């Protein structure tokens, strides 16, 4: 789980305007941070299958948001991919 400060920091970094908390970019950035933390957890706790299922659900949710953004605005999609270093 993300603490308030870390979540606010991510929102401030990726927001499009002053009151933005729910744009696809912000949602993708928050999901990426949660995915990274959960991945570290699963490397230590290999048999935690309940958390692994949650990880797969989050990855799918992020993938759906990325697909939406790619269809809606390819430039914003490319920017978020580069900023978060998601593709090789």
UniProtKB/Swiss-Prot annotation:
SUPFAM superfamilies: S15/NS1 RNA-binding domain
PROSITE patterns to which the protein is assigned, alphabetical: RIBOSOMAL_S15 (PS00362)
GO-annotated molecular function: rRNA binding; structural constituent of ribosome
Keyword hit for Ribosomal protein: yes
Positions of transmembrane segments: none
Keyword Membrane: no
Highest taxon listed in the record's lineage: Bacteria
GO biological process, one term: translation
Keywords, in A-Z order: Ribonucleoprotein, Ribosomal protein, RNA-binding, rRNA-binding
One GO location term (cellular component): cytosolic small ribosomal subunit
InterPro entries: Ribosomal_uS15, Ribosomal_uS15_bac-type, uS15_NS1_RNA-bd_sf
Subunit relationships: Part of the 30S ribosomal subunit. Forms a bridge to the 50S subunit in the 70S ribosome, contacting the 23S rRNA.
Family, per entry: Belongs to the universal ribosomal protein uS15 family.
Matches recorded under HAMAP family: Ribosomal_uS15_B
Function statement: One of the primary rRNA binding proteins, it binds directly to 16S rRNA where it helps nucleate assembly of the platform of the 30S subunit by binding and bridging several RNA helices of the 16S rRNA.
Protein name in UniProt: Small ribosomal subunit protein uS15
Gene that specifies this protein: rpsO
